[in-house]
């Protein structure tokens, strides 16, 4: 939430105000208009702390990815020649904006004054340097002899160019802030004046640091690490899918805030502690650990600190341990198979020797014996051929077991049977199905249940929870493995309450009463007693806040808030259907799966709509 608030403010162009109180008020109004709801008191306090403690000086990096609608048109390692012909015009438009985006990521601050002098200063210094700045599009395209550079190389080069004018900007910023400190109005009380002065001194100190080579090198190194890590993440399919899903989620949120635009025509800026990023890289010198750290920042909303770094190190070591175990098992399997083949070969050699010896003995017995041997040999050959046919035929009838959605298992039909779309069989736990009931009945069940956090909630609170939990129709999308893989990303497995658990996560938009919320559709699963997968958790979680739920944390985070699951309380939903037109209508066009929940008494009235979005296609 903290990162998202600053992110929204940075891109929506908050004007400067004369005091922290005014800038918080101005920011609050803009955010509430964009988010479509009133900020809670805790969110307002968070907003105030952001300006008091940080003054908008948190360090940022550019994510080396370009999105267009629901597609990734440029990835970290993309060269210009790799871009689809139909997307090149759009990409060139974005590339032209890159120098400004990179500059804004370093110099955009929230200053306190009666005008937006800080923004003017930022653009004045940038515009003066336009005469000697390279043509970024031409640079990216390359020449006939050269095939052009990777997108990450272009981004890094632009940051290096911008560093040439940082010293001038830092000097002008520090000088201007010193004047503002002297001109603080006498009408402010001592407490407010001290607070304003502290914020301005932080900005002044930041300006002075920008003049130093140490700070300039830090900015370049942090961005270079980010580019290298993103390129590394892109090589691993599961990490790539979850990474791009989170980038796309932020992209969707910005589009919802800027409701008057269809596209965000620039790469995204993300808030990362430069010094923490560099220290972690220098200490561990491991791309695996850095990739895991960045994924945790993106997927779980963590900051770079000792806790998150240790978590990344543990995750990498555990993954390597499991990989080594799998490699050992594979080596053992290959050795056993080789020994088996050698044993079979020895048996074949011995059999051939016996047959040769037997053949020589029968030849000594006369012509009849030779003829019998020949007929016997033919008969054996015929039986062996028939035996192969029978064996192959029988093996075709033996059902094969294949791991499908969420680790569940199903039988794969033999080659003789008609091939059908791969379907996932699973069960749905009663704690998911209960949200179909009326709020009053749900409340009675929860008050009598074993989950303490749900006890004592009002009917109104339950009604709000029902909006984000009563989405069992999502199960329809999970049945088809191919469709499911296009929409959902699987997280790693973990143990809790004596059961093996995992999640599947997709991007979604919930619409109700003219209000749209971007968030994640979460599916929590555990392995049942017979090895089947059981859905025990299903909800839509808005990304901008946890205010709709009594559950916190990230959709991608390992772990959940359900301590123990009563495994016997689940139902086989493989044949479940709501009566057509009574509760909801489901449609899909390949890129989105849409569920319209309707008034049971008047089915023409749409109460709410949940749209699950496909993972962005990578061109």
From Swiss-Prot:
Any Pfam family hit: DUF3654
Basic and acidic residues composition-biased segments: 350-359, 369-385
Region annotation Disordered: where it falls in the sequence: 350-425
Extent of Acidic residues compositional bias: 386-396
Alphabetical list of InterPro entries matching this protein: DUF3654, UPF0329
Family: Belongs to the UPF0329 family.
The name this protein goes by in its record: UPF0329 protein ECU08_2070
